[in-house]
C-alpha cells in the first residue's frame, strides 16, 4: 500500500488586477506531486479562486491545512497543530522591503519584526519594477514544518518554511535562530552546499504573522531515490550504495574539521545573552567578517523540546547549556535531569487531578525511577581520559553534530553537485556521544557473512532466509558507513567499537524517547551494562574504579522489566501503524476507510478492524 502514497501540492498564483474594484485575485491549485522537488503542477489540478485582499476567505484556508496524512487518535487536534497560516499580503510586502536594503555581510538586520541576511539579497534577482510574489506552491508537508515554493516576478524562486506548532513558542524561536546560524556557518565558514537563508522570523510578530525561514530554492531530485538498502550483493549494488553513502560521509568529514570551545548550539552573536557574547566559538579565525559572527548558546537538541510542553521554560533553561568543553559530565547528566523534571511535572499534574487515570500515574512513577538510575550512572558511562580508547581526547572535543544527515535531506542539483537541507536540532557535542545517521544505523544482531555466521542458512525456507538477509544487509550498510568514517577520520574510528556503543547506549536511548513507554529501552540499556561492568572498570573504559555496579537491581525488578519490555515490543510489532505514532498517509487512510478496515469510533478516533484486513489482503504489487 505504501506504493500508493503521493504528496499533494497546492499552488496559489497571483493574477492580474480584476476590473471590479482593482482587487488582486488568486487561484488555489491542488495537484499530485511525486518524487521530484520541482515537478510542475498537474494539468488536471482543481482550482479555487480567492481575493488576496480577503484574508478571511474560507476557501483560502485549504492552502494552510495539513493534508499529507491522518491519525488514528486525536486527528483533529494534531492537524490543527500542523496548520501553517501566514499572511500572503505580508509576505509580498516583506520581500519588497528586503529589496530596498543594502547588500552587506553583517549581523542579521532587524526588519518589521523579522531578520534579514542582507548579504544574500541577490536571491531576489533583479528588476526595475517592484518585486512581487507571482505564485506560492505547497511542495512538502514534513514532520516538523511545511515547505512552500515562492515564485517572484524576477524569475527567481525561494523556499518558505513554516514550522508546525508542536513545541512552545520559546522552543520554536530558539530552534529557528540556531538553525539559521548553523546554515550560515556551514556556508560561509566551511563553504558547503547548503541553501542560503534570506530572512527569518522567530515568532508571529512580523509581516508574515508566523515564524518562518525564507531561503534559497534548490531544484533537483532527492538522493533518496538512489537509496536501495536491501539489494543483494553485487558490483552494481556496491556502486549504488556508495553513490549515496559517500557524499554524506564527505559532508560529515567537513563538518568535523572544526573543533569548538563549548558544548551547546550555534547562534548569531546578537541572538545569545550578553554573558555569552564575549566567548568566541572556536579558535584561529582569521577572517575579520566572521570572527564575531557566531556564538555558542543553549543546546536545541530535541530532548529539550520534544514532549516538554508541560515544562516551564525557566526549568528547561537550567539544563540546556551551554557547557564548558571540559564538563562532559554536565552534558551527559542534562538528559537525565530534563527527563526527570518533565516526568515529575506530569506526575504533579496527575496528583492534582482527582479523575486522573491510575495507570498513567504508575507509568510516570516508573519513568522517574529509570531517569534517576540514568542520572546516577551518566557521570560514570565513559572515561574521557581512558588509555584503552584510541584518540580519546579527539573523541571528546566539541564538534558540530547534525541529527538529520539523510538522503531524504540531500538534493541532487546536478549529477555531481549535492545540496544538503534540514539542520534543525543541530548541536555541538563530543563525537563519541553522537549516533550514526538513521539511514545506515543498525542496533540489531550483526551478520557479516550469511553462510559463516548463520548455521544451516542454505537449507532454510525462503521466508526464514529473508529474515537473515535483512540483518545482513543492515549490517553491511552500517559497515560501509564505518569504512568511510575510517577513510576520512581514522582518528575518530573508535566510535565503531561495540563496547563504546554499549556504554553510550543509555544516553542515546534517552535522546530518542518519543512516547511514555520508551523509558523501558533506557532501563534496558543500563541493565545491559551490569554484566560487563567489572571488565569495563578493569580496562578503564568507564569513569569509575568501583567494580560494584552503581545501580542495585533485584531479581524481581529485572524479571518485571524484561516482561514489560517484551510486552511493549510485542505491542509495537502487532499494533498497526504504531511505528508512525498512528499516522497514516492520506490516500492509504482514505482507501482503508472505504474498505471498512478503518472504522470511526464514538469519540472520533479510528480503530482497525482486523477481520476486514483478512478480507482485503494487499495485492502483490502493494506488497512490493
Swiss-Prot record:
User: Source organism's superkingdom?
Assistant: Eukaryota
Report the GO terms under cellular component: mitochondrion
Broad class of where this protein is predominantly found: mitochondrion
Quick check: keyword Kinase in the entry? no
Instruction: Name one matching Pfam family.
Output: APH
Transit peptide start-stop: 1-34
| InterPro entries, sorted | Aminoglycoside_PTrfase, Kinase-like_dom_sf, Mito_inheritance_9
Locations listed in the record: Mitochondrion
Please provide the record's keywords in A-Z order: Mitochondrion, Transit peptide
What's the family? Belongs to the AIM9 family.
Q: What is this protein called?
A: Altered inheritance of mitochondria protein 9, mitochondrial
Which organism is this entry from?
A: Candida dubliniensis (strain CD36 / ATCC MYA-646 / CBS 7987 / NCPF 3949 / NRRL Y-17841) (Yeast)
* Gene from which the chain derives: AIM9
Amino acid at each position: 500500500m505504501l506504493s500508493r502514497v503521493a504528496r499533494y501540492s497546492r499552488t496559489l498564483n497571483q493574477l492580474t488586477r480584476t476590473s471590479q474594484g482593482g482587487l488582486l485575485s488568486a487561484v488555489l491549485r491542488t495537484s499530485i506531486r511525486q518524487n521530484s522537488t520541482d515537478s510542475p503542477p498537474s494539468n488536471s489540478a482543481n482550482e479555487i479562486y480567492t481575493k488576496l485582499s480577503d484574508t478571511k476567505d474560507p476557501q483560502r484556508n485549504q492552502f494552510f491545512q495539513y493534508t499529507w496524512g491522518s491519525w488514528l487518535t486525536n486527528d483533529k487536534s494534531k492537524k490543527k497543530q500542523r496548520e501553517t497560516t501566514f499572511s500572503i499580503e505580508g509576505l509580498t510586502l516583506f520581500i519588497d522591503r528586503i529589496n530596498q536594503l543594502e547588500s552587506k555581510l553583517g549581523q542579521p538586520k532587524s526588519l518589521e519584526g523579522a531578520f534579514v541576511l542582507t548579504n544574500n539579497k541577490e536571491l531576489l534577482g533583479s528588476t526595475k519594477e517592484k518585486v512581487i510574489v507571482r505564485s506560492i506552491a505547497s511542495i512538502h508537508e514534513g514532520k516538523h514544518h511545511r515547505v512552500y515554493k515562492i515564485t517572484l516576478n524576477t524569475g527567481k524562486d525561494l523556499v518558505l518554511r513554516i514550522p508546525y506548532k508542536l513545541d512552545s513558542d520559546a522552543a520554536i524561536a530558539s530552534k529557528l535562530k540556531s538553525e539559521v546560524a548553523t546554515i550560515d556557518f556551514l556556508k560561509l565558514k566551511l563553504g558547503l552546499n547548503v541553501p542560503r537563508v534570506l530572512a527569518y522570523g522567530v515568532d508571529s510578530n512580523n509581516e508574515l504573522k508566523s515564524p518562518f525561514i525564507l531561503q534559497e530554492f534548490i531544484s533537483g531530485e532527492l538522493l533518496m531515490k538512489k537509496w536501495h538498502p536491501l539489494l543483494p550483493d553485487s558490483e552494481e549494488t556496491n556502486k549504488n550504495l556508495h553513490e549515496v553513502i559517500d557524499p554524506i560521509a564527505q559532508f560529515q568529514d567537513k563538518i568535523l574539521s572544526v573543533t569548538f570551545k563549548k558544548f551547546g548550539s550555534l547562534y548569531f552573536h546578537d541572538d545569545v545573552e550578553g554573558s555569552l557574547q564575549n566567548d568566541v566559538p572556536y579558535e584561529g579565525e582569521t577572517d575579520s567578517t566572521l570572527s564575531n559572527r557566531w556564538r555558542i548558546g543553549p543546546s536545541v537538541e530535541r530532548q529539550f523540546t520534544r514532549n516538554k510542553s508541560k515544562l516551564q521554560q525557566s526549568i528547561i533553561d537550567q539544563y540546556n547549556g551551554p557547557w564548558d568543553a571540559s564538563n562532559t559530565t554536565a552534558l551527559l547528566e542534562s538528559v537525565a535531569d530534563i527527563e526527570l523534571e518533565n516526568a515529575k511535572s506530569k506526575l504533579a499534574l496527575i496528583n492534582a487531578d482527582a479523575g486522573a487515570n491510575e495507570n498513567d500515574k504508575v507509568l510516570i512513577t516508573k519513568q522517574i525511577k529509570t531517569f534517576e538510575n540514568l542520572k546516577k550512572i551518566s557521570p560514570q558511562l565513559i572515561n574521557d581520559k581512558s588509555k584503552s580508547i584510541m584518540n580519546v581526547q579527539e573523541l571528546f572535543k566539541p564538534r558540530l553534530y547534525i541529527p538529520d544527515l539523510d538522503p531524504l535531506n540531500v538534493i541532487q542539483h546536478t549529477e555531481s553537485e549535492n545540496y544538503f537541507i534540514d539542520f534543525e536540532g543541530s548541536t555541538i557535542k563530543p563525537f563519541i556521544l553522537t549516533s550514526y545517521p538513521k539511514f545506515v544505523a543498525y542496533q540489531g544482531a550483526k551478520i557479516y557473512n550469511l553462510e559463516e555466521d548463520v548455521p544451516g542458512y542454505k537449507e532454510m525456507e525462503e521466508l526464514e532466509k529473508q529474515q537473515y538477509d535483512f540483518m545482513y544487509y543492515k549490517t553491511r550498510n552500517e559497515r560501509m558507513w564505518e569504512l568511510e568514517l575510517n577513510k576520512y577520520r581514522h582518528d575518530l574510528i573508535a566510535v565503531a567499537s561495540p563496547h563504546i556503543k554499549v556504554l553510550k547506549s543509555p544516553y542515546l536511548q534517552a535522546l530518542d524517547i518519543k512516547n511514555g513507554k520508551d523509558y523501558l529501552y533506557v532501563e534496558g540499556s543500563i541493565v545491559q551494562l551490569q554484566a560487563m561492568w567489572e571488565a569495563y572498570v578493569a580496562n578503564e573504559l568507564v569513569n569509575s574504579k568501583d567494580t560494584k555496579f552503581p545501580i542495585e537491581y533485584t531479581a524481581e525488578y529485572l524479571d518485571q522489566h524484561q516482561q514489560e519490555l517484551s510486552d511493549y515490543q510485542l505491542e509495537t510489532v502487532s499494533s498497526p501503524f504504531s511505528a508512525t505514532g498512528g499516522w497514516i498517509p492520506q490516500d492509504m487512510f482514505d482507501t482503508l476507510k472505504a474498505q471498512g478496515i478503518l472504522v470511526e469510533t464514538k469519540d472520533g478516533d479510528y480503530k482497525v478492524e482486523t477481520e476486514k484486513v483478512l478480507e482485503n489482503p494487499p495485492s502483490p504489487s502493494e506488497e512490493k
